[in-house]
Amino acid sequence: MLIEIPNVFSKEEVNQLREELDARTWIDGNQTSGVMASTRKRNQQLDKDDPVALQIGELIMARLLAHPLFVSAALPLQFYPPLFNRYQGGETFGYHIDNAIRSTSEGMVRTDLSATLFLSEPDTYQGGELVIQDTYGQQSIKLAAGSLVLYPSTSLHQVTPVTSGERTAAFMWLQSMVRDEGQRRLLFQLDQSIQALTAQAASEQELFNLTGVYHNLLRRWSEL
């Protein structure tokens, strides 16, 4: 399941974030790569311990945890804190699948879901599409600045070469309360239906029944 979430941050907020990020020292992105990824990856990143990156990462996580669509789709349990990358001058990241487990200072995170928050407007750079291969085929993603795409970490994906301009983004992984992607999809569809029926003033009994089904399935499938 691939979900696009528009306007996580406003244009004004993105401009402020970019001013802070652009002023930092960017390093070779392969300093965070495994052996296989290092042969396919050419980009720049901020150090994971950069204080500004950490501060903005906290802001991103807080914003996402307050976003109903993100919470409904991801059912987040634990984040691997956001990182920041930049592509320019032909830089690219060829097809790969993200590592299954990530280590943080607080323990291990199983990467159930990956997310990219775009911080460059699509008309300011050429190339740089996030191409994701999933059960519905290949999808090419290039969103407005401030918008986010969420997709299963099991997906084969790449960032195509940026042939002009500059593509800056935040990327992150998270462990969901529900490990299985198919179960998460069913819960998401059910939750969206409940919200739609609520907006249509459906009968109270119908909503009680559906909400009960949702929470009983979540109780059965969740791992905490």
UniProtKB/Swiss-Prot annotation:
* EC number(s) from the headed UniProt entry: 1.14.11.-
Keyword tRNA processing carried by entry = no
InterPro entries listed in its UniProt record: Oxoglu/Fe-dep_dioxygenase_dom, PKHD_C, PKHD_hydroxylase, Pro_4_hyd_alph, Pro_4_hyd_alph_FE2OG_OXY
Where on this chain does Fe cation bind? H96, D98, H157
Q: Which cofactor does it need?
A: Fe(2+); L-ascorbate
Query: Sorted alphabetically, which keywords does the UniProt record give?
Result: Dioxygenase, Iron, Metal-binding, Oxidoreductase, Vitamin C
Q: Where is the Fe2OG dioxygenase domain?
A: 78-176
Cofactor, free-text remark:
Binds 1 Fe(2+) ion per subunit.
Superkingdom as given in the UniProt entry: Bacteria
Q: Does the keyword DNA-binding apply?
A: no
One biological process term from GO is:
intracellular iron ion homeostasis
Q: Report the enzyme's class at the first EC level.
A: oxidoreductase
This entry's Gene Ontology molecular function terms read:
2-oxoglutarate-dependent dioxygenase activity; iron ion binding; L-ascorbic acid binding
Q: What is this protein called?
A: PKHD-type hydroxylase Shewmr4_3244
Origin organism is: Shewanella sp. (strain MR-4)
